[in-house]
C-alpha cells in the first residue's frame, strides 16, 4: 500500500514539473505601452517604456553624443487620437536641419510639427530626454510608417552635424528577429492596420 501511494505522489510531482516546463516555454509578452496623463492639458499620452536607441556608426569625440532616440506616441484628447513620432538628436548636431529617417533603406516622408509639444496640446515632451541638451523633433506619424518601423530590420536617422558632415544613427533589430517587438506591441495596442 505504501508503494502505491509513493508512485501516485511521484506521478503528481512529475506532472507538476512537466507543466512548469511547458509554461516556461511559452513566449513572454512584449513590453507594455505606458499611458500617462498630461497634468496641465488633460490629454492622455501613450508611449513606449523607453524610446528606441540609435547608435552612430563612427567615433564622433568624447564631448559629443553617440546616441539618438525615437519613439512613437499617441495623443488622446477627448477621444480624438493622433499619432506622432518624437526624435531626439545629440546636442552637437544641427538643430536647424530636419533629420531624414529611413525604414530599412527607404526614406520616410513625415510632416514636421515645427511648434513643438505645446502646439500639439502637451505641456511637456512625451519622453524624458536622455540628453537634456539634445534637439527634439516632432513628426506626424501614419499607420503605414509605424508598421514599416515595427517590421524593419534597420531604422536610421541622417542629419548633418554642426560642421555640415552627415551623421548616421542606426538601430538594428535583434539577430534572427524580424522587426522591433517594442514598436510592434505599440502598433498592435493602438489597432494599427497592416500588422
Model-derived features: where do they sit?
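Short acidic, glycine-rich loop/turn motifs
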Residues: 39, 103-105, 159-164
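Mature extracytoplasmic domains of secretory-pathway proteins
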Residues: 91-94, 108-109, 130, 134
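Short, solvent-exposed loop/turn motifs
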Residues: 44, 107-109, 165-166
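Internal interaction segment
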Residues: 114-195
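Bacterial N-terminal signal peptides that target proteins for export
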Residues: 3-17
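C-terminal motif of bacterial Sec signal peptides marking the signal peptidase cleavage site
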Residues: 23-24
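An ectodomain-focused feature that recognizes extracytoplasmic/extracellular
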Residues: 28-97
Amino acid at each position: 500500500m505504501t508503494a502505491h501511494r509513493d508512485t501516485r505522489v511521484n506521478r503528481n510531482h512529475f506532472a507538476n514539473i512537466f507543466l512548469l516546463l511547458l509554461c516556461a516555454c511559452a513566449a513572454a509578452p512584449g513590453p507594455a505601452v505606458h499611458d500617462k496623463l498630461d497634468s496641465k492639458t488633460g490629454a492622455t499620452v501613450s508611449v513606449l517604456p523607453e524610446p528606441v536607441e540609435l547608435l552612430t556608426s563612427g567615433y564622433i569625440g568624447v564631448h559629443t553624443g553617440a546616441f539618438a532616440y525615437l519613439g512613437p506616441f499617441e495623443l488622446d484628447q477627448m477621444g480624438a487620437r493622433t499619432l506622432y513620432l518624437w526624435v531626439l538628436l545629440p546636442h552637437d548636431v544641427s538643430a536647424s536641419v530636419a533629420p531624414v529617417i529611413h525604414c530599412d533603406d527607404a526614406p520616410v516622408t513625415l510632416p514636421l510639427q515645427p511648434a513643438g509639444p505645446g502646439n500639439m496640446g502637451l505641456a511637456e515632451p512625451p519622453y524624458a530626454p536622455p540628453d537634456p541638451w539634445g534637439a527634439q523633433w516632432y513628426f506626424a506619424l501614419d499607420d503605414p510608417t509605424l508598421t514599416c518601423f515595427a517590421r524593419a530590420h534597420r531604422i536610421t536617422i541622417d542629419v548633418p552635424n554642426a560642421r555640415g558632415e552627415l551623421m548616421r544613427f542606426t538601430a538594428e533589430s535583434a539577430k534572427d528577429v524580424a522587426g522591433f517587438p517594442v514598436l510592434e506591441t505599440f502598433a498592435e495596442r493602438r489597432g494599427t492596420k497592416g500588422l
